[in-house]
């Protein structure tokens, strides 16, 4: 049986017991309801027995309250461990995070002087000499059309053969040097392209490894979240921060927001949920511990109440038995009033002693009801005895009822006895109580699966 079911059953018994206390007082004061007194007394005893069993079920060494507290303590420890693992994973995930590329060099970037490559342009020296020799206006750099025969004749006339040969050699040298430098630059460019291709391939490979590591971390984070969701259901916690989204909403949000923002929001929600769950578990544990302490105190109280009530019933039952025995043994079925008063007063004194030893409202009310009826009987006996001594033939205002059943009596009771509720099962000698011994044994074996009879 679950803890909530046991607590509900206890509340039902307490409510029914309160009803029985009122019926007990009415039945004792109503002569026509005398036949119901025994049944009401029996039901009160059954209720007290049930309360004792329920409290034992709750506060025993493997009781439901202690089991629930132990379960919550384990849940709290699990929550702390999950949160610790989650924080470590988030920290590790951040260490694997790749920042967006920027054009600016990082602060710790150092130029390697050995890696500096100097590019030469020796061909420009020869080329400049050639331009100076012939003049820039006499080259293709000018807008003059070389096809003009007149200009070409003038240039040839102005230049000697040696000068032209020298200029030609300058061009050859410049061309050779330029070609050599181009070859060197092309070789360097090929090396750069080769290096760049290698870098791109390595970037892909390393990026894949990094994504794999982050994916592995995300997998473990999702497992932790699943465990925390199960824990939420177990402790009855619903997060106001966690909302299920449709697939279209997730895709839409993925397009609008970056992955970093999504993970940051997820981490914030998880941290807030952790704080709320931890607070809830601690509040539940504190409440159950207070309830356990109250039930321990109630166990002692209910045991005392039951013992006092049983003592009261035994004493009253003994008195009734003695009176019935004396009535049956007397020749005229009468007992002298003085003798009867003495027997009743002895019982009243015993009940007064019981009242002095109890300050609980329940037993005080029940025992006082029994005592008050006996006190009224003594008053009537005293009145009868005084009247008899005065020679009066007046009869008592009411017959003295000692709860003896009379055959053939047609007196109808004005007191309606409530039907016995489902959680109390009364039987004959010995009475059967609501919580059976098998339920308690099953509880000790951590397999409470039966309902309270």
UniProtKB/Swiss-Prot annotation:
Where found? Cytoplasm; Preautophagosomal structure membrane; Membrane
Q: State any GO BP term from the record.
A: cytoplasm to vacuole targeting by the Cvt pathway
Residue segments, region Disordered = 381-428, 434-453
Its GO CC terms are: phagophore assembly site; phagophore assembly site membrane
Q: What does this protein do?
A: Required for cytoplasm to vacuole transport (Cvt) vesicle formation and efficient autophagy. Plays a role in ATG protein retrieval from the pre-autophagosomal structure (PAS) and is especially required for autophagy-dependent cycling of ATG9. Also plays a role in regulation of filamentous growth.
Q: Which family does it belong to?
A: Belongs to the ATG23 family.
Q: What is the protein name for this chain?
A: Autophagy-related protein 23
